[in-house]
Amino acid sequence: MGKLRKNLLAWAGTGVAAACAVTMTAVPALSTPEPEAAGVVSASPYLYNGWGNPPSPTEVMNASGIKNFTLAFILADGTCNPAWDGNRPLDGQDKATIDAIRGAGGDVIPSIGGYSGSKLGEVCQDSQSLAGAYQKVIDAYGLKAIDVDIEATEFENDASQTRVLEALKIVKEANPGLRTVVTFPTLVNGPNDVGKRMIDKAARIGSDVDVWTQMPFNFGGGDMAADTITSTEGLVAHLKSAFGYDDATAYAHAGISSMNGKSDTGETVDQAAFQKMADYAGEKGLGRLSFWSVNRDRPCDGAPDACGGIDQQPWDFTKIVAGLQS
């Protein structure tokens, strides 16, 4: 969810945002057209085993009520082969995390890609081999859903965009019921030209992505709740244009992945702003609400991989996402 994930930036400023009370208003659950698979997609914040001091997922589940997590990040191991962070095997530490989450009644959606590292969409030379790499991840964990976080050159390059979309089409056809998420950067008014090109391409080739999730931050400031809603409305408008969706269907194919606390550029998403995003997501029936990251969703000790840089209680943002579970 931005450069803080692997290229930690110098902390901008030393002040901590003022305390912000969270009012947990009741809102409708997010859109769940296929309940078993959709649950892991619709409300699942990011958890990253390869960053800082990751929290125990079962402790977070018990304290917050969250059921599902998006696990970051699967990269290429130097070849067209998937590995956590490009170096941890699929059957290692991260599988133990998945087993623990499932043992506690939850589930996971792995995130493939991210801002940094060697991306499968660039290393794999064609859509068939890329689909094969995705399939290895699906088979390793018996997945109901996958997230492709497409950023940087993988996002900007037309050929790698095409490989990703074609590979997602292949794995959806090979795995009935599998849900696919594409997460990508955006502007205040919605997708940039590269994002629009990607969505238009998916419509042309028949790549049936279930949820297009924007990362509405690193805008440089402003009202983060209002800007997020504006950006999402821009996404919804383009989905309607590209696919011919009606309003309800377009909202169900749109998602938000915010960044709790301080963003890479020093913006602040506090609890009240994130609650407004959650209210909007529930009211509109969005297909997904997430944030970067559970690792940062706790009181701050000054390290950007361990906290969000604002005054908060443990798991404030995770609890907000949990409020949207079906």
Swiss-Prot record:
BP GO terms, sorted: chitin catabolic process; polysaccharide catabolic process
UniProtKB keywords: Carbohydrate metabolism, Chitin degradation, Disulfide bond, Glycosidase, Hydrolase, Polysaccharide degradation, Signal
Catalytic activity: Random endo-hydrolysis of N-acetyl-beta-D-glucosaminide (1->4)-beta-linkages in chitin and chitodextrins
Top enzyme class: hydrolase
Native source organism of the sequence: Saccharopolyspora erythraea (strain ATCC 11635 / DSM 40517 / JCM 4748 / NBRC 13426 / NCIMB 8594 / NRRL 2338)
SS bond partners: C80-C124, C300-C307
Native organism taxonomy: Bacteria, Bacillati, Actinomycetota, Actinomycetes, Pseudonocardiales
Start and end residues of each GH18 domain: 40-326
GN (gene name): chiA2
An annotated Gene Ontology molecular function: endochitinase activity
Name of this protein: Chitinase
InterPro entries on file: GH18_Chitinase, Glyco_hydro18_cat, Glycoside_hydrolase_SF
Active site: E151 (proton donor)
E.C. code: 3.2.1.14
Residues in the signal sequence: 1-35
